[in-house]
Amino acid sequence: MCIRDRGYSVRNLKYMSKFASTYPDEQFVQTVSAQIPWSHNVAILDKVKGEKQREWYIRKTAENGWSHNVLIHQIESGLYERQAIADKISNFESRLASPQSELAVQTMKDPYIFDFIPFKEDMVERDIEQALVQDVTKLLLELGTGFAFLGNQYHLNVGGDDFYIDLLFYNLNLRCYVVIELKTGEFKPEYAGQLNFYLSAVDGILKKDNDNPSIGLLLCKSKNALVAEYALKDMSKPIGVSEYKVTSELPEALSKQLPSVEDIQKHIKRD
């Protein structure tokens, strides 16, 4: 019988052969790769080199329910390099109990890719903040699973004085508030002190008894790693420092290959 009579194209058979040689462990196939659709497995075979990387993307796809286009976006934006093996700067391990500290580190990325923000030379923090809020669907996709957006310029009244947080989230996996502050320039030590204060205020005003300690994330255009490490060393609250990139800073080939706004929004609505 012709192989096409059985519904298998030559291309599909080649992928099946490649799949079998790539994953010789039958138990891995049954318990891990079988959790995601065949088209997703094909995308990972095509685009991901290395056993650890492939397994990581398979597990993340199953965990997050990524569509085919979103999976490709995550691969081409280098999510494994930015989240799984990045040299992240934070004081989470010394300020949070286990396993909360490990989960917080795993959740963090460096850099964050805001490919939906058109770069302008005269952009200030508020411009970036507004652009992120306007496309909150894509912002949540980049931040990762479990994030719920609570507001921007979130007002806190502390002893009669007014303070405003750039972006406030609650993470359902971490079970804590996440305060994000945006900076258009290089990291400065005083930014950590300001965020430390905001976290104290959030813990005092918003945090409930069953919530974990709030976490802060400083997103800067650039950072001196050693300066950031020293700045966080004596901060009392858990804080991470990451860089971010916008559209004009991405390689042209990558920018062309990213999924459309419609693709991402359809995926989020479907979930």
Feature roles, as predicted:
Residues 4-271:
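Basic, low-complexity intrinsically disordered segments
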